[in-house]
Curated annotation (Swiss-Prot):
This is Pancreatic lipase-related protein 2. One of its GO terms (molecular function) is galactolipase activity. It comes from the Eukaryota. PROSITE patterns: PLAT. It is a peripheral membrane protein. It is an enzyme of class 3 (hydrolase).
Amino acid sequence: MMLFVWTTGLLLLATARGNEVCYSHLGCFSDEKPWAGTLQRPVKSLPASPESINTRFLLYTNENPNNYQLITATDPATIKASNFNLHRKTRFVIHGFIDNGEKDWLTDICKRMFQVEKVNCICVDWQGGSLAIYSQAVQNIRVVGAEVAYLVQVLSDQLGYKPGNVHMIGHSLGAHTAAEAGRRLKGLVGRITGLDPAEPCFQDTPEEVRLDPSDAMFVDVIHTDIAPIIPSFGFGMSQKVGHMDFFPNGGKEMPGCEKNIISTIVDVNGFLEGITSLAACNHMRSYQYYSSSILNPDGFLGYPCASYEEFQKDGCFPCPAEGCPKMGHYADQFQGKANGVEKTYFLNTGDSDNFPRWRYKVSVTLSGEKELSGDIKIALFGRNGNSKQYEIFKGSLKPDARYTHDIDVDLNVGEIQKVKFLWHNNGINLLQPKLGASQITVQSGEYGTKYNFCSSNTVQEDVLQSLSPC
């Protein structure tokens, strides 16, 4: 259904309803270029009225984490009567197309924030404008962005709250909504996080139409669905539009999104949610990664690299001297370390059960009497826990040869205390040959710390060999 509405909204051609419409506290909106009548936006239309969109600001704080307080910019008394705290950072969470501000994913982000910080968390509900056909929803976000900007302006003018303390987090169309708000506030907003910004009607458009680095003092972006809308039905932008752009898993296919329709529907509550999750799984991963990053800051390190292909070939490791940024909630800790805009970072994640990953480079030197065909695996044992086995190499196993591979481990094992080695023979060998690891070096990605382990033993296939620090 979501797929149908998106594509229908792009292809329908409508007649112009006028050149401009104005609203008292929001200003005027035109249907002239670049807002409409372009190659990317063939539909000539104006945004719906503020009354029909009915943008609502749902305030959650550490004092009311479960029940929102409705605040309005046109009635500042509602803000003063609420738990809004002028001494805290304010984070807006803005949904996208055919979504609403009371969905669990928005409130879950707020609740996770409350576990790590004192914050004003405002979920922006604009379902009155998001449930339109896509081309109309694209226009409606201009009004929603204006409403967000107006609220921030009221906070500043009447309560002395600084826009630099505002962070806007927007998914899909919500990312461009945040951009509209930031543009109206002259880029004085502290931060905008774009969660897979919507591609249709925004890719390759002028900066004033879409998210770009000038919309806030710091703009970070997570790309999870960058395949083109035609023919791949990718909903997210491939274009780099932030100071820092993260491409987890290369930005196209997210682990766990390959499920068949039955298993996807079983995993969620309700048939409609199941269909939506299937059609937009990659697109939705962006806000799931962000939410997970709040409680797992070190599990989403982004490595600077020219391409995902180079990253996958064990390049771009470890982090450079200035370190690696953390994708998601803590990306702004790297602000100022990465000069310029459109800096590109790559990382891998897990599937729907466990997203964070910790990257290590493992080098194994073999010992034995003869060359064999098979595979070698290792497991890490650290102060914080033990990893499962990870394959390092498969093919011709030669004594004294060194095999190196980067692995993405599903937990932070901490300081590594020992390593276990396992090999398997792909052929039939009645002589029961032995093979071992004479040395294994493990390097962590974040700090480049190296751990060296040695052994003089060899073992038969499928028998664990334990290596201790050299």
